[in-house]
């Protein structure tokens, strides 16, 4: 400010009443070092413009001089003096102040004028500086504490009252005058009671300071003063801004405030005048101007709006923002993200529109608004708020007797069910989640409303839990209907939820296809939230397929995008995926990423916190820190209980932890539950863990069966993440029955697969692995061990799997036909079809040529074929068995 005054002769401090303009002007003036001093002209008590000059003359110590005008006396007195004149409180005398300033600045070349006013004086060369409110986190709190200690000595801000004081300062917008009024109440009220009483702030903050000017005796008087200076048209616009909360733009003002007595084209001019008069604040928000009322000013405007009888202004406000919300459900191509961002910006106005509708019994409109905001509830992590909106009406008996169209109620019930499913307030598939969805479906079918029906079908599919068979018919019908009515957003949600089910399937190929289909549609409508989730599914599919480098790169990319977009749910899931991949890579960074996941998840709560702790469980397990893994797991379990997929996967982790802790019985139970409830990659991992449990319990046959089943599961779906664990288990089991060469070859194949995919063995299994390696090396000797290891490492992944499967043992098979062939016989047929001789086949299978011929003899007998040529022809016709 000193620099401004040094470079400019007229500076005006502007701002709302009570913001501290006068106080700041006095501080600036006191620090002035102008040679001839300063004078302070208090215009607050002056009501007649004709005596402004006389007031200034008295301030500089000039007596009345007969025969000479006051202005002339001032000009002569000030002359060439280097001095500062403060004109305080000019807003009600702008013309007179302007005339005085013109005269004095023109005649007195060394004079500088500092003015305070609720609006600019409006002169050429005037520099306007808006006095901001105090920072509510420090300055305002310090002021409250200072003023409170004056009326209640010993008052301090501590843990028990800090939040309440912060709330007071926030709700009073950091306005010093209002904060001083509030602090004065400490003599008879606690800060918490003061904060609660601010709903009626004008009554609460009515006790001013004796000796202050009248307009600063109470908060109401301060705003009354500004309001009285408005023209009638300005007063009309001012009160019609009252329904807006948090901010608004020009288009919204024109839609809500314009009318027969306020031309839409004049709104901008009138709004600008309200900004000039410090009743409206104008902010630059990323190149766009948004306006807002300070909360105390807005409450005053609400009173004026109520007194005017213009209740329709609230309805127009509600209708404008309801239309904005409705546009979310019908996005043009690639427009969804922009609409969601705009709705997020207007969330306070949307909340106000909903609250006004509910409080005034406009239930249909309130439910429509809540349903239209599903993209916000999901895409911006406002899930609990969305559910609370629906519950505040659907579970309130007062509203049951009010007429609401069946279609609107059906959609509301469906949308509530979807939110409940996501939040998992009960186990997914529970009655209190399914019932609203089924009720919505019955109602939607009754009225034949396609939009309500597609939402209800989607809700039924979602609320079926992770039972793909139960959800499939709902999703199928919903998909067809959404395509028929061109409801792209709902179709995207359907594909999204089907993708969630595919995640549970554990099939990387199916997940990749589902993710790509949903992502493409999401990108078409611009739904980056869903698109990011689909990309995370693709990284998951990469992980299952053993492509850990690609999985890590993609999950990092999506996490960074989510963080930049303030998409916390996707950020949490991205960090979880990263932590999991890093754990399988053996990277120490997994721990830090898991910690970041927990920190981000804490912001959301609920199942996300459970996911964060699950990430830490993976990281700790991989590092061999069983204690830390148990702590993280114990924190995750109760949170994840309502999410079947997460609970099941956590049972796999619990089985590993129990086994590492020596509790094989508990480990077996966890593993059994996981095997029974999972498919695909999840089941492969669960089977491998159960095989470890069986090995630890001295049950080699059970261990062998489960390890082979895990291998078969992975081979069928091309799942390679975790496959080396199954191979190493089979290697150890082979060594125990004397099949040393087979065991070492499997170890070599597993090591090669680990190197190829970058996956490491969790440290908690290292001891068992090293024991198997040591036993096999001792049994074979170094030279034979190394040769067998190299033979296994040279196998391709498919060859290694086939080699491992040959040792599975006999199963019940038909006596004849292709189904009767053993795994080894199938390998022989495949290699014969490739044109290999018996000698070459023997080398590939690590057996003798005579053994190959024996297998062929069995094959000819089982298939009823007389020769090698016919076997090749028949294999080609049927497709070579694998």
Swiss-Prot record:
Which CDD domains does the UniProt entry name for this protein?
A: LuxR_C_like (cd06170)
Induction (record text): Up-regulated 17-fold 7 days after infection of human macrophages.
Q: Which Cys residues form disulphide pairs?
A: none
Q: Does the keyword DNA-binding apply?
A: yes
Instruction: Tell me where in this chain the HTH luxR-type domain is found.
Output: 814-879
Q: Name one GO biological process term.
A: regulation of DNA-templated transcription
Identify the domain of life: Bacteria
- Entry GO terms, CC: cytosol; peptidoglycan-based cell wall
* InterPro entries the UniProt entry points to: P-loop_NTPase, Sig_transdc_resp-reg_C-effctor, TPR-like_helical_dom_sf, Tscrpt_reg_LuxR_C, WH-like_DNA-bd_sf
Record bears the keyword Transcription regulation: yes
Q: Which residues bind DNA?
A: 838-857
Entries under Pfam families matching the protein: GerE
Q: Which UniProt keywords apply?
A: DNA-binding, Transcription, Transcription regulation
Q: Which GO terms describe its molecular function?
A: DNA binding
In Swiss-Prot or TrEMBL terms, this protein is called Putative HTH-type transcriptional regulator Rv0890c
Origin species: Mycobacterium tuberculosis (strain ATCC 25618 / H37Rv)
């Amino acid at each position: 400010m000193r620099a401004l005054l040094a470079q400019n002769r007229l500076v005006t401090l502007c701002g709302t009443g009570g913001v501290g303009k006068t106080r700041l002007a006095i501080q600036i003036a006191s620090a002035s070092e102008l040679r001839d001093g300063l004078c302070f002209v208090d215009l607050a008590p002056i009501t007649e413009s004709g005596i402004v000059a006389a007031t200034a003359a008295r301030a500089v110590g000039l007596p009345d001089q007969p025969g000479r005008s006051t202005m002339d006396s001032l000009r002569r007195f000030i002359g060439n003096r280097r001095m500062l004149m403060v004109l305080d409180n000019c807003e009600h005398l702008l013309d007179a102040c302007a005339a005085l300033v013109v005269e004095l600045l023109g005649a007195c070349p060394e004079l500088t004028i500092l003015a305070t006013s609720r609006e600019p004086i409006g002169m050429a060369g005037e520099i306007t500086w808006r006095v901001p409110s105090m920072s509510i986190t420090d300055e305002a709190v310090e002021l409250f504490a200072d003023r409170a200690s004056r009326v209640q000595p010993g008052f301090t801000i501590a843990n028990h009252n800090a939040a309440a004081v912060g709330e007071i300062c926030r709700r009073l917008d950091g306005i010093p005058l209002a904060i001083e009024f509030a602090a004065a109440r400490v003599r008879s009220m606690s800060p918490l009671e003061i904060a609660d009483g601010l709903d009626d702030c004008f009554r609460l903050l009515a006790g001013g300071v004796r000796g202050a000017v009248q307009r600063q005796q109470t908060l109401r008087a301060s705003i009354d003063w500004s309001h009285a200076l408005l023209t009638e048209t300005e007063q009309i616009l001012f009160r019609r801004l009252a329904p807006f909360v948090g901010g608004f733009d020009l288009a919204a003002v024109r839609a809500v405030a314009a009318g027969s007595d306020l031309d839409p084209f004049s709104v901008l001019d009138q709004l600008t005048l309200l900004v000039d008069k410090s009743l409206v604040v104008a902010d630059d928000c990323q190149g766009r101007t948004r306006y807002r009322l300070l909360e105390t000013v807005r409450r005053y405007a609400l009173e004026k709006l109520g007194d005017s009888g213009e209740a329709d202004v609230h309805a127009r406000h509600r209708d404008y923002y309801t239309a904005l919300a409705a546009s979310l459900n019908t996005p043009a191509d690639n427009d969804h993200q922009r609409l969601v961002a705009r709705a997020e910006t207007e969330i306070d106005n949307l909340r106000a529109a909903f609250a006004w509708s509910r409080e005034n019994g406009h239930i249909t409109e309130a439910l429509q608004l809540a349903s239209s905001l599903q993209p916000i509830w999901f895409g911006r992590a406002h899930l609990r708020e969305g559910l609370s909106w629906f519950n505040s009406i659907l579970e309130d008996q007062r509203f049951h007797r009010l007429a609401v169209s069946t279609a609107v109620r059906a959609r509301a019930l469906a949308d509530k069910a979807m939110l409940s499913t996501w939040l998992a307030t009960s186990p997914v598939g529970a009655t209190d989640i399914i019932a609203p969805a089924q009720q919505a479906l019955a109602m939607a079918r009754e009225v034949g409303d396609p939009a309500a029906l597609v939402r209800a079908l989607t809700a039924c599919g979602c609320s079926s839990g992770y039972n793909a068979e139960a959800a499939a018919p709902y999703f199928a019908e919903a998909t067809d209907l959404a395509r028929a009515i061109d409801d792209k957003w709902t179709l995207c949600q359907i594909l999204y939820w089907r993708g969630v089910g595919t995640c549970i399937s554990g099939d990387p190929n199916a997940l990749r296809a589902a993710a790509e289909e949903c992502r493409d549609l999401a990108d078409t409508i611009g739904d980056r939230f869903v698109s990011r989730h689909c990309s995370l599914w693709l990284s998951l599919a990469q992980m299952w397929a053993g492509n850990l480098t690609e999985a890590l790169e993609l999950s990092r990319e999506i996490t960074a995008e989510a963080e930049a977009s303030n998409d916390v749910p996707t950020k949490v899931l991205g960090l979880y995926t990263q932590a999991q991949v890093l754990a399988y890579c053996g990277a120490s960074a997994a721990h830090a990423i898991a910690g970041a996941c927990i920190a981000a998840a804490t912001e959301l709560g609920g199942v996300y916190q459970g996911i964060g702790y699950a990430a830490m469980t993976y990281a700790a397990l991989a590092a061999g820190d069983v204690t830390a893994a148990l702590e993280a797991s114990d924190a995750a379990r109760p949170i994840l209980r309502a999410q079947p997929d997460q609970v099941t996967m956590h049972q796999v982790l619990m089985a590993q932890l129990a086994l590492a802790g020596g509790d094989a019985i508990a480990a077996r139970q966890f593993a059994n539950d996981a095997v029974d409830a999972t498919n695909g990659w999840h089941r492969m991992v669960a089977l491998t863990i159960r095989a470890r449990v069986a090995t630890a319990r001295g049950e080699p046959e059970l261990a062998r069966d489960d390890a082979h089943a895990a291998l078969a599961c992975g081979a069928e779906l091309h799942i390679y993440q975790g496959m080396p664990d199954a191979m190493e288990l089979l290697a150890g089991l082979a060594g125990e029955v004397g099949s040393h060469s087979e065991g070492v070859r499997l170890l070599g194949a597993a090591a090669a697969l680990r190197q190829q995919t970058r996956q490491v063995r969790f440290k908690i299994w290292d001891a068992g692995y090293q024991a198997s390696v040591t036993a096999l090396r001792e049994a074979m000797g170094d030279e034979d061990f190394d040769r067998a290891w190299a033979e296994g490492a040279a196998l391709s992944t498919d060859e290694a799997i086939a080699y491992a499967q040959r040792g599975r043992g006999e199963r019940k098979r038909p006596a004849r036909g292709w189904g009767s062939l053993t795994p080894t016989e199938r390998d022989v047929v495949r290699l014969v079809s490739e044109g290999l001789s018996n000698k070459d086949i023997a080398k590939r299978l690590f057996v003798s040529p005579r053994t190959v011929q024996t297998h062929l003899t069995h094959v000819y007998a089982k298939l009823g074929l007389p020769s090698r040529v016919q076997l090749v022809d028949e294999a080609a016709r049927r497709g070579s068995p694998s």
